[in-house]
């Protein structure tokens, strides 16, 4: 990118960011997509524009138009005919997987949200009851007795996408890690592994989503005693396999790191090994990993997992930057200044965000003959974290499409 192009881009970015800052919050609340068409897109338009952008400049412009605007949810509005005095629920059934189903609450002839999986087809049953029924009012699953109250049925195809946000009532920045394609053409399976923010303060409804709909069996908590709110077990229940593995983020996990008084966290490699050994056990899935905001430590672990499986640097960066569409905080691959600096977005007393610095260090510290980032990540994991090739192979068997 030439100096003149950089200057023009920076001006566009700053001007756009200033313009949208005051309006994106209200705009996000209005954004819905109805399902009268045969295929729907559960991504907000702003996220779709970002995913479809072909150049770094277009990606950053898309981010500037919407970052921080709470778009981390599914934007499908299910419209149906309704009658006064009736309570409505929409039950969604994956036609390819009978175990994958969920409920969306309706009001005023519309039910917004859902847990749809991109690329899948769903059979929707709209159920309306006149008499108050507590089980139905708080329904999280289908019951056969609801069959007598079905008012409409329709089938809908969900547009394919590498992004599946999980809509919650009391949290933000939760999403499925599935959907990304690897260098070999395989895909990360949906419904296996989820990333997100803290679970402290989860509502009963959100706990039900994690247990009854996502079928979470395990939780990996990346926080330490300074920010975990005293949590040392899963709030999802005693039957959840809970691993506390406090690791650092970005370049802190690399022995060569030393910058502006910041240095390598010597404990991180051992914690990463514990995490990957946990990931290698197929009985721990589906699982959920998180830190506090679901951005830095979570983003670093997602990078190691997806990168070791062969997801490209472009898609690794997209997964990282998707946090910018939530309240988790803006996370970019670099910062905007003259000259343009790629690699470190923030380095001050409040935070250290160094996505590009981490990538460049891993590639230079762990070079391989094929020059692939995925190979350098594997080399780091096997040499520095002492993770066996067998462990990495088992994780691939669980998470990659056949």
Descriptions of predicted regions:
Residues 18-25:
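Hydrophobic core
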Residues 2-14:
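Bacterial N-terminal signal peptides that target proteins for export
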Residues 147, 293, 297-298:
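Ser/Thr-glycine-rich phosphate-binding loops at phosphate-binding pockets of nucleotides
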Residues 1-5, 19, 189, 291:
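A general, composition-driven signal for non-globular sequence regions
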Residues 28-288, 301-402:
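Cys-dependent protein tyrosine phosphatase-like superfamily
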Residues 7-10, 24, 295-296:
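Residue-level micro-sites within transmembrane alpha helices that shape
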């Amino acid at each position: 990118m030439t100096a003149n192009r950089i200057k023009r881009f920076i001006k566009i970015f700053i001007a756009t960011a200033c313009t949208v800052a005051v309006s994106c919050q209200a705009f996000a609340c209005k954004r819905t997509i109805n399902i009268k068409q045969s295929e729907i897109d559960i991504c907000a338009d702003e996220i779709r524009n970002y995913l479809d952008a072909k150049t770094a400049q277009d990606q950053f412009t898309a981010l500037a138009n919407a970052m921080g605007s709470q778009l981390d949810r599914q934007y499908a509005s299910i419209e149906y005919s309704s009658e006064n005095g009736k309570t409505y629920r929409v039950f969604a059934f994956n036609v390819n997987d009978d175990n994958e189903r969920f409920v969306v609450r309706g009001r005023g002839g519309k039910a917004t949200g859902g847990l749809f999986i991109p690329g899948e087809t769903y059979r929707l049953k709209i159920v309306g009851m006149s008499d108050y029924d507590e089980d139905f009012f708080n329904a999280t699953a289908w019951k056969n007795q609801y069959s007598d109250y079905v008012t409409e049925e329709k089938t809908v195809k969900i547009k394919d996408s590498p992004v599946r946000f999980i809509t919650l009532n009391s949290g933000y920045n939760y999403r499925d890690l599935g959907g990304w394609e690897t260098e070999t053409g395989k895909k990360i399976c949906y419904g296996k592994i989820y990333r997100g923010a803290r679970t402290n303060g989860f509502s009963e409804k959100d706990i039900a989503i994690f247990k009854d709909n996502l079928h979470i069996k395990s939780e990996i908590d990346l926080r330490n005693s300074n920010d975990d709110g005293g949590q040392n077990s899963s709030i999802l229940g005693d039957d959840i396999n809970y691993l506390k593995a406090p690791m650092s983020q970005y370049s802190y996990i690399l022995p060569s790191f030393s910058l502006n008084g910041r240095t390598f966290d010597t404990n991180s490699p051992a914690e990463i090994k514990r995490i990957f050994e946990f990931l290698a056990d197929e009985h721990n899935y589906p699982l959920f990993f998180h830190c506090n905001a679901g951005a830095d430590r979570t983003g670093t672990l997602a990078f190691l997992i997806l990168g070791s499986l062969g997801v490209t640097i472009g898609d690794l960066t997209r997964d990282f930057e998707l946090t910018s569409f939530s309240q988790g905080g803006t996370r970019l691959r670099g910062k905007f200044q003259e000259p343009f600096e790629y690699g470190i977005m923030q380095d001050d007393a409040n935070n250290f965000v160094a996505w590009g610095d981490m990538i460049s260090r891993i590639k230079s510290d762990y070079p391989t003959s094929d020059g692939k980032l995925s190979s350098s990540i594997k080399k780091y994991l096997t040499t520095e974290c002492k993770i066996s090739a067998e462990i990495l192979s088992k994780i691939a068997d669980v998470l990659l499409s056949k």
